Amino acid sequence: AVCVSLLGAANIPPQPLNLLQFKNMIQCAGSRLWVAYVKYGCYCGPGGTGTPLDQLDRCCQTHDHCYDNAKKFGNCIPYFKSYEYTCNKPDLTCTDAKGSCARNVCDCDRAAAICFAAAPYNLANFGINKETHCQ
């Protein structure tokens, strides 16, 4: 089940449902807030180039590649594809049909959330200048 608080929602721009689901998966698998990953390293957040800075940054690079692979299956747009999953902290289970776009995207997000939870967090890699550190 997905629970989303609408308190303060007037100040939050609308986001694709998938990104909300991914945020909730991150919270289910680990203890860090999703915002800790938005500007981390070379690959966490929008885009990504260069060599990943550490294990956590590699999790984000792998997630990017997973989404790229999901896009190869028909009309699958990962950022906008909602999916079904269950959270039994810290376990995540994707429940859509295997091979479907929704399942592929869910599997990408699940793997990333688990990877994030297992990876050490280096505060020095948050908010770096990607132009100078990610060549």
From Swiss-Prot:
Its main location: secreted. One of its GO terms (molecular function) is toxin activity. Expressed by the venom gland. GO terms for cellular component: extracellular region. Its cofactor is Ca(2+). Ca(2+) binds at Y43, G45, G47, D64. Keywords: Calcium, Disulfide bond, Hydrolase, Lipid degradation, Lipid metabolism, Metal-binding, Neurotoxin, Presynaptic neurotoxin, Secreted, Signal, Toxin. InterPro entries: PLipase_A2, PLipase_A2_Asp_AS, PLipase_A2_dom, PLipase_A2_dom_sf, PLipase_A2_His_AS. SMART domains: PA2c. CDD domains: PLA2c. It is found in: Secreted. Its EC number is 3.1.1.4. GO terms for biological process: arachidonate secretion; fatty acid biosynthetic process; lipid catabolic process; phospholipid metabolic process; positive regulation of fibroblast proliferation. The active site is at H63, D109. Binds 1 Ca(2+) ion. It catalyses: a 1,2-diacyl-sn-glycero-3-phosphocholine + H2O = a 1-acyl-sn-glycero-3-phosphocholine + a fatty acid + H(+). Disulfide bonds join C28-C87, C42-C134, C44-C60, C59-C115, C66-C108, C76-C101, C94-C106. Belongs to the phospholipase A2 family. Group I subfamily. D49 sub-subfamily. Snake venom phospholipase A2 (PLA2) that inhibits neuromuscular transmission by blocking acetylcholine release from the nerve termini. PLA2 catalyzes the calcium-dependent hydrolysis of the 2-acyl groups in 3-sn-phosphoglycerides. PANTHER family: PHOSPHOLIPASE A2, PHOSPHOLIPASE A2 FAMILY MEMBER. This is Basic phospholipase A2 KBf-VA.
